[in-house]
């Protein structure tokens, strides 16, 4: 399955269809229709949160899905598919790719990422695993553990990389990531314009994930209203 999945997303746009509990569009049904609209617009894949949303999306589209499970724990800042329990639950949906936080931060219940990846590969040998990284150190760490894909998802969202943007200094972080690993790099995180998406692919990223700029109307509206307020 791995090679065919990778071919399907190569050089393309993956749209992240997520709405958390406190957001107006929080609904598996709505996310499934959002995914359908994205695919009709040319998306080659979907990134989705929770098994419920994933299954609804699977009933609407036939493209590779990057599955995650966002869950907060009191003893850790890691929240993207943080423990073996969540990783297993997402794998059980049959998604082609499962993404998880691959930072060097302490995980909930002191679980070890190396142990999680080793255990889940035995249970789901045909599933691809994507590392959501923040820093370059995270990239090296994820690479050493044997993740199939490296994502820049958490760049700008960890304490170490707070307030940084993937386009800063002419995409210097992305260029460093691409030099640091031979694994396929998935550009993700603050890719909020078509030009940024084109640029990261031109640099050599395997695919690009775009979320809020496409699927969060409240964020899109805010960008317009903030600009209008400058008049």
From Swiss-Prot:
It catalyses: an N-acyl-D-glucosamine 6-phosphate = an N-acyl-D-mannosamine 6-phosphate. Its EC number is 5.1.3.9. GO terms for cellular component: cytosol. Keywords: Carbohydrate metabolism, Isomerase. Pfam families: NanE. InterPro entries: Aldolase_TIM, NanE, RibuloseP-bd_barrel. Pathway: Amino-sugar metabolism; N-acetylneuraminate degradation; D-fructose 6-phosphate from N-acetylneuraminate: step 3/5. Gene3D superfamilies: Aldolase class I. GO terms for molecular function: N-acylglucosamine-6-phosphate 2-epimerase activity. One of its GO terms (biological process) is N-acetylmannosamine catabolic process. It comes from the Bacteria. Converts N-acetylmannosamine-6-phosphate (ManNAc-6-P) to N-acetylglucosamine-6-phosphate (GlcNAc-6-P). Belongs to the NanE family. This is Putative N-acetylmannosamine-6-phosphate 2-epimerase. It comes from Listeria innocua serovar 6a (strain ATCC BAA-680 / CLIP 11262). The gene is nanE.
């Amino acid at each position: 399955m791995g090679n065919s999945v990778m071919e399907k997303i190569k050089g393309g746009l993956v749209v992240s269809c997520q709405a958390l509990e406190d957001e107006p569009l929080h609904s598996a049904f709505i996310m499934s229709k959002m995914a359908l609209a994205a695919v009709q617009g040319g998306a080659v894949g979907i990134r989705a949160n929770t098994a419920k949303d994933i299954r609804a999306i699977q009933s609407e589209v036939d493209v590779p899905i990057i599955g995650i499970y966002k869950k907060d724990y009191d003893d850790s800042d890691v929240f993207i598919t943080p423990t073996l329990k969540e990783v297993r639950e997402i794998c059980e949906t049959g998604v082609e790719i499962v993404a998880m936080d691959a930072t060097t931060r302490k995980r909930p219940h002191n679980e070890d990422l190396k142990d999680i990846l080793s255990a889940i590969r035995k249970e789901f040998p045909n599933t691809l695993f994507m590392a959501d990284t923040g820093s370059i150190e995270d990239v090296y760490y994820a690479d050493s553990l044997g993740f199939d894909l490296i994502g820049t998802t958490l760049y700008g969202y960890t304490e170490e990389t707070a307030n940084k943007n993937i386009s800063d200094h002419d995409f210097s972080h992305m260029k460093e990531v691409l030099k640091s690993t031979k694994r396929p790099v998935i550009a993700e995180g603050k890719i909020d314009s078509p030009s940024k998406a084109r640029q990261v692919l031109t640099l050599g990223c395997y695919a690009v994930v775009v979320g809020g700029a496409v699927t969060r109307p409240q964020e899109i509206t805010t960008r317009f209203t903030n600009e209008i307020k400058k008049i």
